């Protein structure tokens, strides 16, 4: 089913009717607003409002200068007391460590009887030979005086009182120069004798080349030395015999 709405008339309504309608609408709105204000609010919604009002009404606690100063002093005293406690704890730990270290040393040390024997022996040696010690000290002092007076000597000998070995004082610059010169000389000799320009070969190669190039063919000379082992000497002799036998066969066939 289709519902048809009535068409509005195009004739304008009178002004009095328009004013009456506006007044009626405004009166209805005021009545609704008044009803809403008159309705009592629920308890759950009213409680937070009351709490907020109470919190706003409460004033901050008053703190006098004397009370603030007393609190600051108390905090300072607490900090100092904690620092003192830490220091005392550290001292106790150090004392314990020292005690343990001393105990460990005592365990590692020799027995008292052996220590007494060593001390008595050292004292007896010192009593017997005080003159020798004085003589040695005098000699060493004289040697030091001579070393100071001698300006021409470049190398000085330094001897300590409790050491027997002597040490030589040398400049490192001189050592470096000497080493560099020696290396340069070695390099020059090697380049002259065994460089790319030098025509150096072994004796066997030189003789073999001459024998090959000469019109009269000869055997490649292979010298025997006493430094070789017996096996090398035997091998050289066999090689020579074989070579001679081959040459003799070739001549007979010709």
UniProtKB/Swiss-Prot annotation:
There is a cross-link at residues 127, 157 (Glycyl lysine isopeptide (Lys-Gly) (interchain with G-Cter in SUMO2)). It is found in: Nucleus, Nucleolus. GO terms for cellular component: chromosome; mitochondrion; nucleolus; small-subunit processome. The modification Phosphoserine is found at residue 129. GO terms for biological process: maturation of SSU-rRNA; ribosomal small subunit biogenesis. Residues 71-90 have a biased composition (Basic and acidic residues). Pfam families: NUC129. Residues 18-31, 48-61 have a biased composition (Acidic residues). It comes from the Eukaryota. Keywords: Isopeptide bond, Nucleus, Phosphoprotein, Ribosome biogenesis, Ubl conjugation. The keyword Nucleus applies. Residues 1-90, 235-254 are annotated as: Disordered. Part of the small subunit (SSU) processome, composed of more than 70 proteins and the RNA chaperone small nucleolar RNA (snoRNA) U3. Belongs to the UTP16 family. Functions as part of the small subunit (SSU) processome, first precursor of the small eukaryotic ribosomal subunit that coordinates the first two steps of ribosome biogenesis in transcription of the primary transcript pre-RNA and pre-18S processing. During the assembly of the SSU processome in the nucleolus, many ribosome biogenesis factors, an RNA chaperone and ribosomal proteins associate with the nascent pre-rRNA and work in concert to generate RNA folding, modifications, rearrangements and cleavage as well as targeted degradation of pre-ribosomal RNA by the RNA exosome. This is U3 small nucleolar RNA-associated protein NOL7. The lineage of its organism: Eukaryota, Metazoa, Chordata, Craniata, Vertebrata.
């Amino acid at each position: 089913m289709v519902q048809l709405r009535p068409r509005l008339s195009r004739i304008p309504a009178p002004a009095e009717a328009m004013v009456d309608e506006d007044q009626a609408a405004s009166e209805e709105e005021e009545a609704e607003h008044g009803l809403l204000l008159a309705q009592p609010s629920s308890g759950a919604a009213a409680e937070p409002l009351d709490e907020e009002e109470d919190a706003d009404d409460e004033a901050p606690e008053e703190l006098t200068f004397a009370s603030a100063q007393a609190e600051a002093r108390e905090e300072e005293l607490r900090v100092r007391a904690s620092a003192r406690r830490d220091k005392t704890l550290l001292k106790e730990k150090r004392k314990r460590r020292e005690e343990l270290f001393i105990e460990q040393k005592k365990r590692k040390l020799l027995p008292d009887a052996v220590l007494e024997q060593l001390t008595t022996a050292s004292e007896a040696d010192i009593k017997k030979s005080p003159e020798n010690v004085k003589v040695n000290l005098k000699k060493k002092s004289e040697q030091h005086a001579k070393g100071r007076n001698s300006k021409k000597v470049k190398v000085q000998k330094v001897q300590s009182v409790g050491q027997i070995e002597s040490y030589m004082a040398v400049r490192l610059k001189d050592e470096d120069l000497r080493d560099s010169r020696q290396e340069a000389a070695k390099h020059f000799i090697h380049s002259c004798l065994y460089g790319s320009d030098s025509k150096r070969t072994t004796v066997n190669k030189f003789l073999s080349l001459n024998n090959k190039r000469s019109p009269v063919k000869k055997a490649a000379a292979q010298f025997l030395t006493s430094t070789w082992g017996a096996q090398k000497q035997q091998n050289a002799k066999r090689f020579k015999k074989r070579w001679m036998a081959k040459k003799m066969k070739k001549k007979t066939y010709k």
